[in-house]
């Protein structure tokens, strides 16, 4: 329908290839982040409606002794702690959604493209556990990094750098492979 009406030609002629790729990349990242964050926010709001907002008591997992990253912040300022984790989940959601975008330029199979973020997520976990067992390296397993009670101070670099590295690698694949694949 668009080709017959020549509407698509105006779209092609009014935007450059680079701007189109940047818009696709940013849109995919933001949508992936929102897909992860919206259920978390709905859950947070529903919990806040029905559970009293009491300050956490320092016991068990929530000891303020420095064994877990930001546990003092959790005890003292719970909503700031929650906001930081929601932002981190947004960044991870966007990073793994961009993996699917980049893999769509490598594979022609749509089923494989949909599975690539999950394969990457679990693959990082397997590689992280193997390196930890063989060489004693700190874990960069996404499941461990996103669990708020298991994150230690030694993993802060992995916590910050992992989604950035994933996004940069996916962006390079997308911009290099996608530059040859557009009709502009």
Question: What is each PLM-predicted segment?
Answer:
Residues 22-105, 142-162:
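Secretory targeting signals
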Residues 6-8, 102:
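A residue-level signal for alpha-helical anchor/packing sites in multi-pass solute transporters
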Residues 44-56, 109, 129, 133-137, ...:
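Transmembrane helix-loop junctions in multipass membrane proteins, especially transporters and channels
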Residues 102, 164-184:
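Junction motif at the cytosolic side of a transmembrane helix
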Residues 11-17:
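Short helix-to-coil transition segments within interhelical loops
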Residues 1-3:
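Short, small-residue-biased leader/transition segments that mark boundaries at the very start
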Residues 111-124:
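Central hydrophobic cores of alpha-helical transmembrane segments
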Residues 129-150, 165-169:
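Extracytoplasmic/secretory soluble proteins
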């Amino acid at each position: 329908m668009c080709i017959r009406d020549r509407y698509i030609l105006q779209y092609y002629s009014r935007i450059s290839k680079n701007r189109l790729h940047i818009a696709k990349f940013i849109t995919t990242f933001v949508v992936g982040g929102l897909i992860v964050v919206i259920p978390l926010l709905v859950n947070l709001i529903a919990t806040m409606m029905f559970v009293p907002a009491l300050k956490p008591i320092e016991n068990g997992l929530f000891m303020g002794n420095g064994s877990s990253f930001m546990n003092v912040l959790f005890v003292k300022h719970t909503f700031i702690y929650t906001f930081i984790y929601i932002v981190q989940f947004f960044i991870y959601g966007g990073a793994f959604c961009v993996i699917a975008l980049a893999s769509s330029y490598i594979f022609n199979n749509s089923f494989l493209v949909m599975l690539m973020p999950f394969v990457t997520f679990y693959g990082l976990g397997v590689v992280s556990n193997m390196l930890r067992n063989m060489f004693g390296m700190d874990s960069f397993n996404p499941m461990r990094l996103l669990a708020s009670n298991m994150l230690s101070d030694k993993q802060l670099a992995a916590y910050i750098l992992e989604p950035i590295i994933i996004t940069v690698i996916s962006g390079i694949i997308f911009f290099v492979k996608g530059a040859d694949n557009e009709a502009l």
